[in-house]
Amino acid sequence: MVVPNGEGDKTAAVVGLQFGDEGKGKITDYLSGSYDVVVRFNGGTNAGHTVVTDEGTFKFHLLPSGSLRTSYVVLGSGMVIDPVALIPEIEIVRKINPALKIIISRNAHVVTKMHRQIDVEEEKIRSSLMIGTTAQGIGPTYEDKYARTGIRMVDISDIDLIKEKIETMYRMHSNLLANTEFSNLAKREEMAKEIYEAGIKLTGYLDYTEVAIDRLYSQGKRILFEGAQGVFLDPDFGFYPFVTSSNTISASVYTGTGFSLRKVNRIIGVAKAYVSKVGEGPFPTEITGDLAKQLRDLGGEYGTTTGRPRRVGWLDLPMLKYAVRIDDVDEIAITKVDTLGMLDTVKVCRQYLIDGKPIDYVPRDMNTIKKIEPVYDEFEGWGAISDSISGRKISIDQLPSKLVKYIKYIEDQVGKPIGIISMGKERNRTVRIIK
């Protein structure tokens, strides 16, 4: 049962409604103070979540964004984990939240340096069909997972098994790696040793996470699931082939953790007040030129993982409606309203036209997408939002009237309530709206 205004939910999931980079980390951090457990269920270091607190700015790629405030964090079996990259994140979090209990799936697959190299080599082969990969080795790791040749977290305290699996992986990908440093056996053995040394440090955190999560749930713990990326990067429901390699929708809570989606009380979809994207692929409402640079600079739109400038565009309601339906969200959290409001004129895509005729769906084949003509509605910018508007809950009447108009317009078009807005980097600038 969904509880009004999200109060008292025993379980909830946070998922992205666009191309990732929506601000899920900030929303998760805001919510995590009310939850005992935060669980990640997909992706790896290709995710980048930034959290700003009184203690400083923290960027997470593997640990959930709620790690600073909650009691338990879980890395589920649907993730792919770089054990070498994970250790520094744990060390940082321990300084802020020393009592945090960390549980890592024994069955999660391991990202290696060799996978990163394969990622680079595969992108070269794609040539004109490049997808703009983050080169974090995520796709190749999932490839090895489904080829049944991958290394799992449970393997990484066994040096002989690591070496054996690395050699199998090398033979599988030798055509790509022949002219790289990994053609050298000594380099592969050095990589195996590095994984093993990290594995020794992480072994104590390993568990069957599907059992651990169910146990915590049975003990009455409140659980928050944190997704990575967004609907339009999902390989089944996004703009294929410009997608990631793990499923990103809310149903992935089940496949990535073993926890039934029927037990999730609330699904919160996160969207920016505009749209941003890293990498290649379709972007129907993309803004270019000076206005794009202005919006990018106002919003600090540079990738947490890659540092690349993000592409930016107007809020796309056909995409948002589609994502809300696929994720079956109960409410929407809107981020970066402070950034968008600084523009004199704000546009929203209300409708797609193809060959001059309206359509009521989001095409996902490249030839049709190229024909999309967005139809826009325009709003006046609402300017700077007062610093006095902060705290966990506010009345909608405290917001600028032009922003309220924008929020209500989106709610009317999409048919879901906007329950949370974020209007700045600081933790206290994310608020629940009381209407």
From Swiss-Prot:
Its main location: cytoplasm. GTP binds at residues 20-26, 48-50, 310, 336-338, 422-424. It catalyses: IMP + L-aspartate + GTP = N(6)-(1,2-dicarboxyethyl)-AMP + GDP + phosphate + 2 H(+). SUPFAM superfamilies: P-loop containing nucleoside triphosphate hydrolases. The active site is at D21, H49. Mg(2+) binds at D21, G48. InterPro entries: Adenylosuccin_syn_GTP-bd (IPR018220), Adenylosuccin_syn_Lys_AS (IPR033128), Adenylosuccinate_synth_dom1 (IPR042109), Adenylosuccinate_synth_dom2 (IPR042110), Adenylosuccinate_synth_dom3 (IPR042111), Adenylosuccinate_synthetase (IPR001114), P-loop_NTPase (IPR027417). Binds 1 Mg(2+) ion per subunit. Its cofactor is Mg(2+). Gene3D superfamilies: Adenylosuccinate Synthetase, subunit A, domain 1, Adenylosuccinate Synthetase, subunit A, domain 2, Adenylosuccinate Synthetase, subunit A, domain 3. Its EC number is 6.3.4.4. Substrate binds at T304, T305, T306, G307, R308, P309, R310. One of its GO terms (molecular function) is adenylosuccinate synthase activity. GO terms for cellular component: cytoplasm. Belongs to the adenylosuccinate synthetase family. This is Adenylosuccinate synthetase. It comes from Thermoplasma acidophilum (strain ATCC 25905 / DSM 1728 / JCM 9062 / NBRC 15155 / AMRC-C165). The lineage of its organism: Archaea, Methanobacteriati, Thermoplasmatota, Thermoplasmata, Thermoplasmatales.
